[in-house]
Swiss-Prot record:
This is Ribulose bisphosphate carboxylase large chain. InterPro entries: RuBisCO, RuBisCo_large_chain_AS, RuBisCO_lsu_C, RuBisCO_lsu_C_sf, RuBisCO_lsu_fd_N, RuBisCO_lsu_N_sf, RuBisCO_lsuI. Binds 1 Mg(2+) ion per subunit. RuBisCO catalyzes two reactions: the carboxylation of D-ribulose 1,5-bisphosphate, the primary event in carbon dioxide fixation, as well as the oxidative fragmentation of the pentose substrate in the photorespiration process. Both reactions occur simultaneously and in competition at the same active site. It comes from Darlingtonia californica (California pitcher plant). Its cofactor is Mg(2+). It holds the Pfam family RuBisCO_large. Belongs to the RuBisCO large chain family. Type I subfamily. CDD domains: RuBisCO_large_I. The basic functional RuBisCO is composed of a large chain homodimer in a 'head-to-tail' conformation. In form I RuBisCO this homodimer is arranged in a barrel-like tetramer with the small subunits forming a tetrameric 'cap' on each end of the 'barrel'.
């Protein structure tokens, strides 16, 4: 008797509108754009099938397992308001489909194969609900927000950073000099650019040594704890760990990784090393726009941010909001909360499709970086609050008097904004005036 072979409709097996989701399911919200003539139910079911147990036909080995236990299910579909032929398909995946503690495996399953699917014109993963049963299998950030503040002895204000420019071409000695000037001027951190690894003009070991010298000199002179994000990203995991080990031997507080170009496996390994050895971990999101910039295809950054919190990092770049559209402000603050808070309520206006309970996974500090300067300080302080890192590259090094005065300007502006806020002044309305007053100090 056997079974009926041949091509079959996915929706017969994988579209289950009556399904009640379980607390242990991983839930995904996909923005689906079906090809002309493909019904939305079939498109949603195809996504559920191809990202879980399905293939295009019935195979005899289906009889050797329980499909009901292991299959992904498309349990709800809704049209996207204001968009033609776009739908949000909600898919539930049983927990057994995923390896514990592996972001790599989670992404390989959920977004691995299905994005090239013929029945779909475009597909975007908008959000994931990670159940506590799964998030508990991850170490998460090496230290988290509170432990970082305790290590640095800095409370009640955002932290200040600066990316050293020009990002490529400086010798290690001159690079270290720029680091010293910025830290001496009042910044908490300086930063390797994401593409500073170990190039012919500046090998990593030389850079680490000169930056460590700059850190210790600035600490001795200011009495504050300082750091420089030493970029440990490398061509192999072994080389990356070797660089992190050297940073630890130098006694510096923080290293850095490009988590998308370096990959989740490397990132999780480095994160474990950092917790075991007391290093903070700064994460840069180089390559994110390749994945998240298209509105109807790819993966939204809020998913990449959640994945980073699971894989591990103490800081991550998350956009600046300033000067962008109001709607983007809400969306950005949505994933900033996903990085910092323990529990985030579902809120479609902010792009949050599911309530997310992180239980006790440490939080990540969002980093505002890119085209910002002192006149943005009131807005940044108001938008991001205390638990953030504000990073000014050109906004520090572009000061007409030099690097150290640029750093002083940023620190004075920040302290003025925090004081004004604590005194009850309205940063949004009086921001420029607060900065003008600070200039007279």
């Amino acid at each position: 008797v056997g079974f009926k072979a041949g091509v079959k409709d996915y929706k017969l097996t994988y579209y289950t509108p009556d399904y009640e989701t379980k607390d242990t399911d991983i839930l995904a919200a996909f923005r689906v754009t079906p090809q002309p003539g493909v019904p939305p139910e079939e498109a949603g079911a195809a996504v559920a099938a191809e990202s879980s147990t399905g293939t295009w036909t019935t195979v005899w080995t289906d009889g050797l397992t329980s499909l009901d236990r292991y299959k992904g299910r498309c349990y709800h579909i809704e049209p996207v308001a204001g968009e033609e032929n776009q739908y949000i398909a909600y898919v539930a995946y049983p927990l057994d489909l995923f390896e514990e503690g592996s972001v790599t495996n989670m992404f390989t399953s959920i977004v691995g194969n299905v994005f090239g699917f013929k029945a779909l014109r475009a597909l975007r993963l908008e959000d994931l609900r990670i159940p506590p049963a799964y998030s508990k299998t991850f170490q998460g950030p090496p230290h988290g927000i509170q432990v970082e503040r305790d290590k640095l002895n800095k409370y009640g204000r955002p932290l200040l950073g600066c990316t050293i420019k020009p990002k490529l071409g400086l010798s290690a000695k001159n690079y270290g000099r720029a680091v010293y000037e910025c830290l001496r001027g009042g910044l908490d951190f300086t930063k390797d650019d994401e593409n500073v690894n170990s190039q012919p003009f500046m090998r990593w070991r030389d850079r680490f040594l000169f930056c460590a010298e700059a850190i210790y000199k600035a600490q001795a002179e200011t009495g504050e704890i300082k750091g420089h994000y030493l970029n440990a990203t490398a061509g192999t995991c072994e080389e990356m760990i070797k660089r992190a080990v050297f940073a630890r031997e130098l006694g510096v507080p923080i290293v850095m990784h490009d988590y998308l170009t370096g990959g989740f496996t490397a990132n999780t390994s480095l994160s474990h090393y950092c917790r075991d050895n007391g290093l903070l971990l700064h994460i840069h999101r180089a390559m994110h726009a390749v994945i998240d910039r298209q509105k109807n295809h790819g993966i939204h950054f809020r998913v990449l941010a959640k994945a980073l919190r699971m894989s591990g990092g103490d800081h991550i770049h998350s956009g600046t909001v300033v000067g962008k559209l109001e709607g983007e402000r809400d969306i950005t603050l949505g994933f900033v909360d996903l990085l910092r808070d323990d529990y985030i309520e579902k809120d479609r206006a902010r792009g949050i499709y599911f309530s997310q309970d992180w239980v006790s996974l440490p939080g990540v500090l969002p980093v505002a970086s890119g085209g910002i300067h002192v006149w943005h300080m009131p807005a940044l302080t108001e938008i991001f609050g205390d638990d953030s890192v504000l990073q000014f590259g050109g906004g520090t090094l572009g000061h007409p008097w030099g690097n150290a005065p640029g750093a002083v300007a940023n620190r004075v502006a920040l302290e003025a904004c925090v004081q004004a806020r604590n005194e009850g002044r309205d940063l949004a309305r009086e921001g420029n005036e607060i900065i003008r007053e600070a200039r007279k100090w």
